[in-house]
């Protein structure tokens, strides 16, 4: 037996007992006759005292260094009051070692384990097995385990079945590029790794498994924007005989119970707010707004239709908008800070930023545009924005999509500068009534906003043939603190409607049959009404753990370039393997 207890287990009640511990040397302090070693495992740290009265064990302690794997036997004793360490769960006791054995020595690690170092993330990823020894990473992975376990237990109690779906599936166009797997047995043919189990879970509904879930691994060969991974984990769910409210109510109950269990110290406003897509875009410029703070967008367009200021007027005459944000108490912002905010909106596509400072002393307004307005227009803007002395008004004039994107960026930037987002608040909300399709200007066709299996709202069905852009979907997104936490919809369950949507999306009958024939045929054998959702596990745990990226809550993530620095994947393969697969590599010139 290597150990009788873990390094986080011993308490004053164990005093006088002979125990055996095994773990890693966290810290070592040599005081000559006395050597103190903090022995660590994932359960905690225990201070071990090596006294020269036990010379064999003391000699072992003289040789060990950080991260040696050590087994120690000895007697538990109470620490003197002045030596109690309140930062350790085991801080009231220590182990007086009588025997010790080095189970494995260790080279000097390239990263500090005992404390957070300033090393580059690439070093952490290359030596991830060392990085994972750190308290922060252990805490994150334990939290992840608790989240997944809670979900499994909750859904089991709700009558759901956890059913695994295949990893090797048919390649179908669902948005991002598929990861392809060549078939040795069928030369020239390929499997795909699933971007999601979307079609398979719908087929499970046809099969009669009315409550399905899976902790699903998903794969997308897309350009790695910001904080994405080529492989990720989602809670995949589907239910039969449900409408939108049924799905939303279940998920809200589950996430409320989850958060109150695993992060009880966080504030969780309930019930979750519900915003239509149109309302979210109008008020926040985003379909995933952070609702922990205000800074809402204010539409000024109707006040400026006749304005002599040509910048605003030209935008409005071309179908654009003029919108602004009131930054309360920010009249003290310097010109340099305002220039930085201008760069923020330019990153969102805006050509510039109009601004006005309302001084606190009742003095003259400073503004980049007020002098160009007609009498009364600036006063109308101040009134509409409910501005007060000491406020900073920030305005963008452009096409609606640019106004939304630029003011969304500005809103988030201001919130960060002003520290408006409480890190201990979890602000969930539902975004509903998404458009079913959006026009792709480059390819001159309609694209599905979510995916082609999303059902249109019944009351909008008559618009499919005449005005598809106005058709709303039975789709919903769960948002959390400015992130999309999960997306779902009520699905199409009739072949004729599914074919109508395929046709609208420019998918011919021949292509639909080739790509989705199995789905269309299944719908002819009594497919029930059904719907589901797929919250992302990585993103959820990231937010609950207060981490900046999903890489911090994944055991072995890849870089933004989709490279595994630890194993050097992807890597070349043996020519013999390629030959067996009937594949020849043609490198780009």
Curated annotation (Swiss-Prot):
EC id: 6.1.1.23
Residues at the site labelled Important for tRNA non-discrimination: 31
Binding of L-aspartate, residues: 174, 220, 450, 491
A Gene Ontology molecular function term of the record: aspartate-tRNA ligase activity
Entry keyword set: Aminoacyl-tRNA synthetase, ATP-binding, Cytoplasm, Ligase, Nucleotide-binding, Protein biosynthesis
Entry-linked InterPro entries: Aa-tRNA-synt_II (IPR004364), aa-tRNA-synth_II (IPR006195), aa-tRNA-synth_II/BPL/LPL (IPR045864), Asp-tRNA-ligase_1 (IPR004524), Asp-tRNA-ligase_1_N (IPR047089), Asp/Asn-tRNA-synth_IIb (IPR002312), AspRS_core (IPR047090), GAD-like_sf (IPR004115)
Presence of the UniProt keyword Transmembrane in the record: no
GO biological process, one term: aspartyl-tRNA aminoacylation
UniProt: ATP binding residues: 220-222, 229, 484, 536-539
Catalytic activity of the protein: tRNA(Asx) + L-aspartate + ATP = L-aspartyl-tRNA(Asx) + AMP + diphosphate
Localization annotation: Cytoplasm
Main location as per UniProt: cytoplasm
Keyword Thylakoid: no
Organism superkingdom: Bacteria
Disulfide cysteine pairs (residue numbers): none
One Pfam family linked to the record: tRNA_anti-codon
PANTHER family linked: ASPARTATE--TRNA LIGASE, MITOCHONDRIAL, ASPARTYL/LYSYL-TRNA SYNTHETASE
Similarity field: Belongs to the class-II aminoacyl-tRNA synthetase family. Type 1 subfamily.
Functional summary from the UniProt entry: Aspartyl-tRNA synthetase with relaxed tRNA specificity since it is able to aspartylate not only its cognate tRNA(Asp) but also tRNA(Asn). Reaction proceeds in two steps: L-aspartate is first activated by ATP to form Asp-AMP and then transferred to the acceptor end of tRNA(Asp/Asn).
Entry protein name: Aspartate--tRNA(Asp/Asn) ligase
Native source organism of the sequence: Chloroflexus aurantiacus (strain ATCC 29366 / DSM 635 / J-10-fl)
Gene: aspS
